Amino acid sequence: MGIISSFMRADHERLAEVFRQFSAAREKDMESAKVSFSVLDSEVRRHFDLEEQVLFPLFEEKTGTSSLNSKASVLRIEHKQVLECMCRIKSMLDDGNLETAYVENRILEIMKSHRDNENNIVYPWLDEALTSEEIKETDSRMRKC
């Protein structure tokens, strides 16, 4: 497995654990849920920024596709859908409502195929298509996000 794939798959696994921690915290009490959700929200946004600012533009450049008709454009739409769900959860928590499981399930539905596309198409393609120098530069940029 290449550098980009390894790094991003590990980040996906870490995010899945942060998501599980939020779900568990929500079962405890409101304060735990809010603190855990804040961490989740921050980490998801960091991850999406990394992809949208570093990896997706590189993928589009190297494949010769535009941001309107590439695999990355679909992934960006899914990011937007997840962020809308995250905003819904935040609003629910702010209103004192811990019943966010159905919104969490929607996020999980979106993310299953999303992660598969990234892990099985985008990241491996980048690992194969980029020169060793481009991979070093990309790795450095990923670690700064």
Predicted regions mapped to residue ranges:
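Small-residue-biased structural context
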Residues: 1-145
